Every structure is written in C-alpha cells, then in structure tokens.
Regions:
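C-terminal boundary/linker segments immediately following FHA domains
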Residues: 2-7, 15-17, 29, 34-37, ...
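Short coil-to-beta-strand transition motifs
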Residues: 21-25
Length: 93
C-alpha cells in the first residue's frame, strides 16, 4: 500500500498552497492499495469533504477518481496530480 500525505506542510506528498492557514499542515491521508483501491482519511480541524459531504475524522472512506474531494472547502484534489510513482508533488488550489 502507498500512503500519500496531503496538507500545507512542505514535507507532504501533495502540498496545498494555502495562505489562509485553513488547510492543516497534515490535512488528510490518501491510501492506495496495490489493486488500485483508495481510501482517504481526514486528519484536520476544518474538514475533508467527499462529494460535498464532510467525512468523519480518522475514519478511512473509500474514494475513486470520479469522486470530488475537497479540503476545508478551499482546495480540491486534482486526481490527475495524484502521484503514480511515489514522488512528492506540489499542488496549488
């Protein structure tokens, strides 16, 4: 399984540039199995949303590339930018 950290901290795998500090340093985790199944886990104070519904903190929620995933309603996950080979990327909302 690959685990991708998402947040405003520069050490995250997917970095969200957020000058308002609404995005947490480590906002969420995206887990991807070797079979391509994915879950997202909210680790923030301001929430992670899947298809407009706030998910419970620290509970893995199944997602697909067709789902809309947003962070504190200020940034959306661009599925085309999810790392495919484990490299860190920069993601600007």
């Amino acid at each position: 399984m690959k685990v991708y950290s998402i947040g405003r901290e520069t050490g995250c795998d997917i970095v969200i540039n957020d000058s308002t500090d609404v995005i947490s340093r480590r906002h969420a985790i995206l887990n991807v199995t070797s079979m391509g199944k994915m879950t997202i886990v909210d680790q923030s104070h301001n929430g992670t949303y899947v298809n407009g519904i706030r998910i419970a903190p620290n509970v893995p929620v199944p997602v697909t590339r067709k789902d809309s995933v947003s962070f504190a309603h200020v940034a959306r996950l661009d599925w085309n930018r999810v790392p495919k080979s484990g490299e860190a990327i920069k993601y600007a909302s």
